[in-house]
Amino acid sequence: MTVTIEDIKRIVSLQLGIREIGDDDRFLEELGAESLDVMNIIVAVEEKFNLQIKDSEIPDYPTSAALFKLVKDRSQ
């Protein structure tokens, strides 16, 4: 499955109920997400793209662009 940044932003948008999301908008600081929201985003990404993200890695992926790079790298 080919992943695009739009795929990731769609997941974030659905989880947070926000229509417009920039590639580099930080989930917590700029989009107003709470910790549980971020966990839900991560779980949705894991399920959609069939990969595992360790809890300790979550702070390393605070934006849609960062999550996109992770999914793209692990999908190859």
Where do the language-model regions lie?
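Thiotemplate assembly-line natural product biosynthesis machinery
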Residues: 1-20, 72-76
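Structural motif detector for alpha-helix initiation sites
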Residues: 5, 23-24, 38, 55, ...
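Generic structural marker for isolated residues within well-ordered, non-membrane alpha-helices
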Residues: 9, 24, 42
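Phosphopantetheine carrier-protein modules
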Residues: 13-30, 48-60
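Phosphopantetheine-attachment site and its flanking helix in carrier
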Residues: 29-48
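C-terminal structural segments of small proteins and small subunits
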Residues: 52-54, 58-74
